[in-house]
Design a protein with these regions (language model features):
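Boundary/entry segment of secreted carbohydrate-active catalytic domains
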Residues: 1-15
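Active-site-proximal loop/turn and secondary-structure-junction residues that shape catalytic pockets
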Residues: 9-11, 34-36, 68-71, 96-100, ...
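Acidic/histidine-rich catalytic cores of soluble enzymes
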Residues: 19, 121-221, 228, 272-274
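Structural motif
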Residues: 25, 86-87, 185, 234
Length: 275
């Protein structure tokens, strides 16, 4: 397993800071966010080369990138995919097919399947693999929902990215064992974060409201000790991408990220020793 750091937490920071922090903390590499306002804009894929080179100076690989891409016609997708491949980025997360109640699930699924077919053809031509992340507010928030999208797709071209933290704090909640079971042929990435729910105030109706928040990996509702044990016992050799979405001052985010990485590495070591 490779453990990489998702670069969303570095909004506004130079790429030199990304490399310095990730290498000092001990990450294997980077999950590069390709999004307007971040280090690479999807309309300017030529910037990828310089970013990958700079991170390499800190001893970091860039095995994967995260995009918002769902419609292959929205940008020059072949150019973007080919640039990823040329720079050794072989795993690319797609964007979100959002659930819109007024449209309805069936037409949304039909559109997503059509776009996925086009994306799969482009990915195969470029020699990269795509990943669909489980995420709230989408038609792929749970394992069961994602499986409906993935049926018929070659896992070497399109895979899936379970994210137990999203499933806990957002929607798509289901037994994590079921998630990993139903998606097993396609899993190439696992999102690593944790969170929980807390009682809030009552609505006028008297109904109790609840709110969620991100928590350290050892402190939330996701049983990472069990999940890591499962990944080790099944010889998972994909990517673990660690997300630090904490809404605290930047130095504190880095401190918590250090704790999270050390925790996940300890779980891997202990699970391996027990095999």
């Amino acid at each position: 397993m490779q453990i990489v750091l998702f670069t969303k937490l570095f909004l506004g920071q130079p790429i030199e800071e990304v490399g310095a922090v990730a290498s000092t903390l001990g990450f294997d590499g980077i999950d590069l966010l390709v999004r307007p306002g971040f280090h690479v804009d999807p309309s300017q894929p030529e910037a990828i080369t310089a970013v990958v080179h700079r991170l390499g100076e800190d001893g970091l690989r860039v095995p994967m990138a995260t995009t918002d891409l769902t419609d292959p016609a929205a940008i020059d997708t072949p150019r973007l995919f080919n640039t990823f491949a040329e720079n050794g980025i072989r795993l690319v997360r797609l964007g979100y097919w959002k659930y819109i109640q007024s449209v309805g699930y069936a037409p949304l699924l039909e559109t997503a399947r059509r776009q996925l077919e086009e994306l799969a053809s482009l990915a195969e031509a470029a020699g990269i693999t795509l990943a669909i992340q489980l995420h709230g507010g989408t038609i792929h928030g749970s394992g069961a929902q994602a499986a409906a999208l993935l049926q018929g797709h070659d896992p070497r071209v399109i895979g899936v990215y379970p994210d137990p933290g999203n499933q806990t704090v957002q929607d798509g909640r289901e037994d994590w064992r079921f998630t990993f079971d139903i998606l097993e042929p396609w899993i190439n990435t696992v999102g690593v974060k944790n969170g929980g729910w807390f009682p809030s105030t009552n609505a006028v109706s008297g109904q109790r409201r609840w709110h969620s928040d991100w928590l350290g990996l050892a402190d939330g509702m996701v049983p990472w000790d069990d999940i890591v044990g499962h990944l080790v016992s099944t010889d998972f050799d994909g990517v673990l991408t660690l997300h630090s979405h904490y809404e605290v001052p930047y130095p504190q985010v880095i401190d918590q990220t250090r704790l999270d990485l050390n925790y996940i590495r300890r779980l891997i070591a202990e699970s391996g020793a027990s095999q």
